[in-house]
């Protein structure tokens, strides 16, 4: 099992990385989408901070709690990241649709709101990788 200091280190790193991703989105969103209100930008910042926390916590589990199979960092981080952003896409489909059309255009290849699921997979795997490497115990 993981010690308390490694656990807290993992949480701090996960939340920090999530906050950094959210901050990036907070400042880049107005560059790509004109007249975007402050609420979705703040929501994005809070979402990815929570996202980093959840990915960091799930990285503490070596085995699936119910099914019992091994869960390496790349599996838990990518699956949890994709799942979290799938929930985001389902809840805010209309808002994401308008945003994605604003970024990629009406006929753009990546205009579907469900591309945020792939984004979540990549960001989740990245956060899981960094938190796993940084919280290893000697």
PLM features per residue range, with description:
Residues 1-138:
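Juxtamembrane/disordered regions of integral membrane proteins
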């Amino acid at each position: 099992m993981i010690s308390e200091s490694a656990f807290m280190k993992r949480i701090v790193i996960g939340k920090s990385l999530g906050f950094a991703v959210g901050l990036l989105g907070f400042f880049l969103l107005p560059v790509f989408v004109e007249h975007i209100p402050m609420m979705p930008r703040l929501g994005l910042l809070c979402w990815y901070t929570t996202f980093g926390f959840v990915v960091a916590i799930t990285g503490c589990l070596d085995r699936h709690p119910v099914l019992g199979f091994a869960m390496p960092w790349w599996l838990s981080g990518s699956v949890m990241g994709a799942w979290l952003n799938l929930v985001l896409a389902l809840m805010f489909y209309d808002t994401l649709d308008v945003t994605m059309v604003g970024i990629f255009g009406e006929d753009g290849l990546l205009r579907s709101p469900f591309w945020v699921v792939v984004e979540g997979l990549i960001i989740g795997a990245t956060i899981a990788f960094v938190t796993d490497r940084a919280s290893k115990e000697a």
